[in-house]
């Protein structure tokens, strides 16, 4: 594909974008900041700024809990784009970012999400400078993890032998991966999948659909 060189405009502003704590974005309490300066150093004052987020599903993982699963298998989150903040920079070229546009992710996402954030700062002419940043988004404050030692078949599939006794480990962590204090009553339901589950769950979307249907075939319920 050919691209006309004159269609590509270099940034005329330097943009500094800070999201969350620099490592994790809290979807329910999104905060951040941006500062825009012209390349010669003058603040880009009174400039319109737009922040967009491209969201996609990722596996939820915490250091030290590699053998645990934290994602809701009955949920699927496809790639989605949202415009989350629109504002105007102050005299110093700065803009505080806050929004509740991501709070609706709670209950929709199976776990953590990846966010590709794109900020555009506009000139009076309509041209704009752009910057991007990728960050992990946490839609939840607390994550329950389930850990169980599985066996592998000759084809490499993991399974549990129903004729044997198994230990199921449960942990409750905050969004930073630290154990939550206190105690909670947990109801654990075990579902037995048929031998063709791998065919019915060949994609992330169909996996979620299969898991939802499996909720109607309870194999065993445990109290913890």
Language-model region placement:
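A structural signal for beta-strand and strand-to-loop patches characteristic of beta-rich domains
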Residues: 1-224
């Amino acid at each position: 594909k050919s691209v006309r060189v004159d269609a590509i405009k270099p940034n005329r502003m330097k943009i500094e974008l800070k999201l969350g704590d620099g490592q994790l974005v809290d979807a329910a309490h999104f905060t951040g900041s941006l500062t825009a300066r012209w390349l010669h150093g003058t603040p880009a004052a009174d400039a319109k700024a737009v922040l967009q987020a491209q969201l996609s599903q990722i596996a939820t993982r915490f250091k030290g809990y590699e053998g645990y699963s934290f994602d809701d298998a009955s949920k699927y989150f496809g790639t989605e784009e949202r415009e989350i903040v629109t504002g105007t920079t102050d005299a110093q070229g700065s803009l505080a970012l806050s929004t509740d546009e991501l709070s609706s992710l709670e209950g929709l996402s199976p776990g953590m999400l990846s966010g590709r954030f794109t900020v555009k700062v506009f000139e009076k002419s309509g041209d704009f400078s752009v910057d991007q940043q990728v960050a992990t988004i946490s839609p939840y404050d607390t994550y329950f993890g389930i850990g169980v030692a599985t066996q592998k078949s000759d084809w490499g599939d993991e399974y549990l032998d129903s004729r044997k006794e198994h230990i199921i480990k449960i942990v409750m962590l905050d969004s930073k991966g630290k154990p939550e204090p206190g105690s909670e009553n947990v109801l654990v339901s075990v579902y037995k999948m048929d031998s063709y589950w791998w065919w019915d769950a060949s994609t992330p979307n169909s996996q979620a659909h299969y898991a939802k249907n499996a909720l109607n075939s309870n194999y065993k319920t445990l109290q913890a």
